[in-house]
UniProtKB/Swiss-Prot annotation:
GO CC annotations, alphabetized: cytoplasm
Spans traversing the lipid bilayer: none
Domain of life: Bacteria
Keyword Lipid metabolism: no
Binding positions (ATP): A332, P333, G334, I335, K336, G337, M338, K353
Name of encoding gene: aceK
Catalysed transformations (reactions): L-seryl-[isocitrate dehydrogenase] + ATP = O-phospho-L-seryl-[isocitrate dehydrogenase] + ADP + H(+)
Origin species: Methylibium petroleiphilum (strain ATCC BAA-1232 / LMG 22953 / PM1)
Record-given protein name: Isocitrate dehydrogenase kinase/phosphatase
UniProt entry keywords in alphabetical sequence: ATP-binding, Cytoplasm, Glyoxylate bypass, Hydrolase, Kinase, Nucleotide-binding, Protein phosphatase, Serine/threonine-protein kinase, Transferase, Tricarboxylic acid cycle
GO molecular function: [isocitrate dehydrogenase (NADP+)] kinase activity; AMP binding; ATP binding; phosphoprotein phosphatase activity; protein serine/threonine kinase activity
InterPro entries hit by this protein: AceK_kinase, AceK_regulatory, Isocitrate_DH_AceK
Amino acid sequence: MAGSFVTTLNDPRAFDIAQALLDGFNRHYKLFRQTSAEAKQRFEAADWHGQQRAQRERIEFYDLRVDEAAERLENEFRASSLSEETWQQVKLYYIGLLINHHQPELAETFFNSVTTKILHRSYFRNDFIFVRPAVSTEYIENEEPDSLPTYRAYYPSRPGSAEGLRETLLRIVDNYQLQREFEDLGRDIDYVLQAFRNQFGDVKLSANFQIQVLASLFFRNKGAYIVGKVINGFRETGFALPVLHNSRELLTIDTALFGEDELLLLFSFARAYFLVDMEIPSAYVQFLRSLMPRKPRWELYNALGLQKQGKNQFYRDFLYHLRHSSDSFRIAPGIKGMVMLVFDLPSFPFVFKVIKDFYPPQKDTTRELIQSKYQLVKTHDRVGRMADSLEYSNVAFPRQRFEPELIEEIRHFCPSLLEEEGDSLVLKHLYIERRMIPLNIYLQEATPEQMKHAVIEYGNAIKDLVAANIFPGDMLWKNFGVTRHGKVVFYDYDEIEYLTDCNFRKVPEPRTEEEEMSGDIWYSVGPKDVFPETFGPFLLGNPTVREVFMQHHAELLDPAFWQGRKDRIAGGYVHDVFPYDPHKRFRRPLGLGFGSLDAEAVSLHPASATTQLGHNPI
């Protein structure tokens, strides 16, 4: 039936099913948007635990609504028994319902999510689901009188005058109507104004000089971000202004970020999703893409918390790449994992990870436990140090594109997840992550200067994870990767734990000569016990690496460091981890602003570690 097309919409059930599907999506997006909009009140109230909880729970909304919709279709329409012709009509009616919809691309993805739970894999083609988008997202506008525009444009009253620009910047901040006082907004605007001068220098202002700012704030963890761009002539420069609470519980603008590189760091795939109140998400993506043209649309949808849309868009990009490439999938280079089989396509900058059916004795785990660890990372604050992953089910690959060694590897380690259907290999479950250079390989090939800064970055990554209440579990170099821009990121999650669930202990003193000389562990070890003093022999065999590590991160071998961070988090403290180099922060007079926070932030992130290893963010 491929390629056939219904010419008559004659099944009344098809319209009712389409309407039920759209009702399910509209309910989902209403709840999604409500949670995102409430982020402003949580930020104003400094409700950091509430903000983190909302970020976690919002991720779960989508699957709940999909399950509800699938159950309704089965109960009311016996959806799984309907004919192919009826399902084609359902899609056509659904397209008609989306003509004036403000989130048509999200609604199409929701349609796919529900119908693929009901229909057999043979239906997974464009006749029945949205393999390709059907409704344009260009130039969608909300025509309602009281609606907010996607962005506001500001024209400084006296171009070339510092006073005119200053008043404009004050008005930009004031228009967000934050219900908490700034410590000194005038002072902060002066800092921003100076940052603008430093960025743009003595440029001639064109007739079209303007500042465009997205109408909603971007909330994540303890920060709110004003995101916009400066247009002057043919030049457009993106910027972001982070607004934080200081130690006096007043607001301050912490810094000004400019240009694609700094915004890429803010919107990194290794960070938690933003909470943003959006009526027309495609318009936000289009605006953000103008600030970061190197960032694909699917990553921007992810960053906005619309990870299912990002996942759908990514898969379309992958199929397009597959069609226009000819290289073969292979076993990924590097040390093979004990719980994951990893493969890649050399021409495609991602890796595919499949959970094995069995594990060596030292890995006391299960498939369900491993999947729960990946879900933990998905819903947790990744603080720029844990790679986001895309989870897929029932993915069909062309058999002829697989190297024979890879097929045999999958047959051996993952037989329960493999279906061989003619020319296709179907994997029932897998994760896809961005490809990085394993840190152990990077260190082997690095120059002395690169090695030094990679080791510093490695320690910074662990400290950032600790600040987010994460203990990596297995801290070996091979479980960390270096991105193409030099950032060190953790990507092996099967042993990850909450820091507050671990018991950090000092190695006991031996009581006898036999215990002192024993090559075995003679003291008792509980299931969540961790002995930081024992990290050294596994990590620091290279004398040069050891010297750098001990100079910058010796405290990681001290149980007191870990226990101190654990106690503070258990006491309710939410650490600050900044998505920009701390040396970029505005420096305020002594006694004002963040107080001791400045010292802690700088000690966690030596500026040279990131600027020397790679000046670009992830």
